[in-house]
């Protein structure tokens, strides 16, 4: 989800880069913040979007599931007083922190931030040795729990679907053999095994562990489910004329956002396998191009922007539809609750 997946963000000299909001101008153009408007930033992070929205005169409710981000954002809370509210929460719960039908805009920047990648103790990066954690908050199941406890069949599904890893069976079986001798504890521990069983080829542009680390992070934080629930919640929270803007960095996430807006356009759909559904009242209309990506100039300055895609929709007066997760066709993956038992 980042320019150097699993490996941290670096500048030309190899040092960590400061967090730069991706597609900021495009986000603001789609969101149209202005005095008197109430915007929810579902992924506060380092506050890049929130700062720009506040500068445009709007009021902001910002959410983040990472307590580190909440602590770092207290200076912004003090600086902006009543115009800015910062809440420790997953963005799938945005309805708990905003008036139903009262928001003028919602912006979601999906994925792990460069700051989280650069903190070795968070366990997101295989290039920085640390505990095999990957949780965006301190709660729930860690990546080590998944690797050491999940059935081989579940590991294969997780790596294949969430990481699009073609060597998923080989890696999963190697994990099973190794954990029987000694459990996995660190990022380098797991990355080393993956590199051993699937060595990098000359033509490979990424580290062999990249896709597995991505899959584990998405699974541990239920990132796809969180995104889907956030889209449904935003639909109910936005007033007519309100704007929903989502920035994604991975094909799976973009597919979810694209499917959501396509479904909410209200057009009839069907296939040779399914009956044609009748047209429904659209709850969202398109804003500008169906998808916006970063310019070469931005990607050169901020490599993380290279894979970014922005999609946006304008809320209509039609009533919000039911939150039906079957819309996205998620496979049946292992239960986080059982792994954490």
Curated annotation (Swiss-Prot):
Catalytically driven reaction(s): cytidine(1402) in 16S rRNA + S-adenosyl-L-methionine = N(4)-methylcytidine(1402) in 16S rRNA + S-adenosyl-L-homocysteine + H(+)
GO annotation (BP), single: rRNA base methylation
Record's subcellular location: Cytoplasm
Keywords: Cytoplasm, Methyltransferase, rRNA processing, S-adenosyl-L-methionine, Transferase
InterPro entries with a match to the protein in the record: RsmH, SAM-dep_MeTrfase_MraW_recog, SAM-dependent_MTases_sf
Pfam families: Methyltransf_5
Binding site for S-adenosyl-L-methionine: 47-49, 64, 91, 109, 116
Record flagged with keyword Membrane: no
Organism for this UniProt entry: Rhizobium leguminosarum bv. trifolii (strain WSM1325)
GO cellular component terms given for this protein: cytoplasm
Function recorded in the entry: Specifically methylates the N4 position of cytidine in position 1402 (C1402) of 16S rRNA.
NCBIfam families on file: 16S rRNA (cytosine(1402)-N(4))-methyltransferase RsmH (TIGR00006)
EC primary class: transferase
Domain of life, source organism: Bacteria
The name this protein goes by in its record: Ribosomal RNA small subunit methyltransferase H
Keyword Methyltransferase: yes
GO molecular function, one term: rRNA (cytosine-N4-)-methyltransferase activity
Entry's family note: Belongs to the methyltransferase superfamily. RsmH family.
Enzyme Commission code(s) on record: 2.1.1.199
